[in-house]
């Protein structure tokens, strides 16, 4: 079972052979027994079994070289072991069905290399609950060295704007609402009264006219959060607030705006917010540092809370919905548990996540009102609430 051939070239030719269009040139002087070249797992995956009629033809030598190169390349992707094992199985099946290793390699090269081959294998990368948060480019735009694209994230943000504007336009057209409100007008009035009560309750020490200056901005923030958060509950849609950069940009812009309001109202005296009255002088530097860190972390906490709740909630619904879908196909004596139980689970989780999405808009708005109250009243908040 041993025969002579020429020396094998360096295995670095693997990358060139698979990812480029360079032809394979194999010069071998000695080819060991095929079991030396192919360990048990390789010979099983690629179905390389020596028989009594093997002769050292150039075609067989080239085929062995190609298989070794493919296996060495696959071995470099241990982090994607599941996809690599699937690739081995597919390649072995194609060879057993009559394709030559040279033809398989040419097909891999024509398809863009081994990376593309693995990625395009059906089932190589199973769908995960986090796939629903993937940002997918719809229209690619290149401006010089800048890469701009119209993505699904931008699309759903625009849809939210259009939906809110259309809702308020329908309610306020023809000079105002009806004396007997319909369902849409009742919804808008409910949002208006809800946000107005939050502003009046949470922001103290200001006249009604001054509070009205903050009301439109807070109302817009609440309305867009209210319509934006539950979007992910619609099948095949996208949750904008499930991305940390979006919520962080929103929270930082609000944080900067509130800080500007504080300086406009108090000037440099706004820094007294960092040092409560009556603090002993030795503790002042320590407390100023703590208050500064606490104040700056408000921007992070506002964004992280919304992002974490949306992402965790929607992921949980995805996971348990997949489990429920599997249970629906179980046919056994436990009919109620196997068929009706998962349906109730999905309905309950959907209602729960819908409530969480709406409540997060409420919590974010309350937090904004509290931060604005702190910036406008400084340390007078305690006396106001008392």
Swiss-Prot record:
Instruction: Give the stretches traversing the membrane.
Output: 150-170, 243-263, 270-290, 310-330
Q: Which residues form a coiled coil?
A: none
- Keyword list, A-Z: ATP synthesis, CF(0), Hydrogen ion transport, Ion transport, Membrane, Mitochondrion, Mitochondrion inner membrane, Transmembrane, Transmembrane helix, Transport
The UniProt record lists the keyword Ion transport: yes
Name a single GO cellular component.
Answer: mitochondrial inner membrane
Q: What binding partners and quaternary form does the record give?
A: F-type ATPases have 2 components, CF(1) - the catalytic core - and CF(0) - the membrane proton channel. CF(1) has five subunits: alpha(3), beta(3), gamma(1), delta(1), epsilon(1). CF(0) has three main subunits: a, b and c.
Q: Sorted alphabetically, which NCBIfam families does this protein's record hold?
A: ATP_synt_6_or_A, PRK05815.2-4
Instruction: Name it.
Output: ATP synthase subunit a
Protein's organism: Triticum aestivum (Wheat)
């Amino acid at each position: 079972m041993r025969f002579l051939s020429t020396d094998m070239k360096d295995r670095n030719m693997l990358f060139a052979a698979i990812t480029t269009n360079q032809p394979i040139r194999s010069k071998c002087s000695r080819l060991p027994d095929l079991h030396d070249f192919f360990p048990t797992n390789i010979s099983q995956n690629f179905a390389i079994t020596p028989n009594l009629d093997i002769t050292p033809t150039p075609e067989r030598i080239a085929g062995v070289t190609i298989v070794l190169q493919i296996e060495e390349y696959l071995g470099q992707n241990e982090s994607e072991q599941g996809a690599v094992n699937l690739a081995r199985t597919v390649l072995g099946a194609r060879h057993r069905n009559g394709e030559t290793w040279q033809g398989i390699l040419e097909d891999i090269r024509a398809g863009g290399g081994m990376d593309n081959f693995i990625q395009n294998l059906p089932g190589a990368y199973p769908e995960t609950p986090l796939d629903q948060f993937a940002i997918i480019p719809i229209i690619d735009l290149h401006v010089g060295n800048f890469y701009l694209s119209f993505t699904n994230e931008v699309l759903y943000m625009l849809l939210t704007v259009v939906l809110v504007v259309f809702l308020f336009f329908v309610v306020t057209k023809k000079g105002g609402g009806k004396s007997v409100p319909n369902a849409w007008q009742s919804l808008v009035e409910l949002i208006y009264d809800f946000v107005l009560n939050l502003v009046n309750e949470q922001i103290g020490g200001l006249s009604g006219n001054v509070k009205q200056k903050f009301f439109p901005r807070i109302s817009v923030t609440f309305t867009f959060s209210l319509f934006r958060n539950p979007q992910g509950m619609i099948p095949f849609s996208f949750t904008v607030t499930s991305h940390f950069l979006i919520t962080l940009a929103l929270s930082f812009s609000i944080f900067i705006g509130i800080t500007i309001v504080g300086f406009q109202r108090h000037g440099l005296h706004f820094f007294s917010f960092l040092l409560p009255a009556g603090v002993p002088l030795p503790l002042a530097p320590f407390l100023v540092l703590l208050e500064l860190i606490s104040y700056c972390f408000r921007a992070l906490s506002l964004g992280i809370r919304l992002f974490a709740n949306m992402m965790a909630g929607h992921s949980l619904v995805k996971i348990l919905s997949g489990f429920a879908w599997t249970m629906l196909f179980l046919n056994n004596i436990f009919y109620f548990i196997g068929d009706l139980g998962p349906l109730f689970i999905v309905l309950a989780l959907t209602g729960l996540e819908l409530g969480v999405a709406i409540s997060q808009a409420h919590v974010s708005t309350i937090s904004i009102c509290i931060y604005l109250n702190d910036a406008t009243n400084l340390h007078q908040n305690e006396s106001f609430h008392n």
